[in-house]
Amino acid sequence: MTNISPIEALGDPTRRQLFERIRRGSCSVTELVAIVPVSQPAVSQHLKVLRQAKLVRVEKQGKQRIYHLNPVGLAELRRYAESLWEDVLQAFGEKAESMANEMEESHIDDE
């Protein structure tokens, strides 16, 4: 199986749409085919990528394949988002400190 990151997998609009539907609740391939403007084989390929990224898992129930969210890929996605947020907060803190220093220097120059 090819290794693909959750971020890469969600880079495709059709996969994002499928993922969002599964996020709202487990569903069958038939239900997923009904929500996107692509063929059933194309949906199956998109679902394969989501499985490879560990964002979804599949369970066979009789003749149907039911897709569920996979906590493994979601945890990786969360770690990535948290690292981005930490970078944003650090940059914000640095900018705020820089602006405070500029204001202080400006205030000293005005005296």
Task: Locate predicted features.
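Basic, alpha-helical helix-turn-helix
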Residues: 15, 62-63
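Short alpha-helical elements of helix-turn-helix
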Residues: 4, 10-16
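Base-recognition residues in the alpha-helical recognition helix of bacterial helix-turn-helix
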Residues: 20, 44-48
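Helix-turn-helix
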Residues: 40-41, 65
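C-terminal regulatory/oligomerization modules of transcriptional regulators
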Residues: 1-2, 9, 21-35, 40, ...
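Beta-hairpin "wing" of winged helix-turn-helix
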Residues: 51-62, 68-69
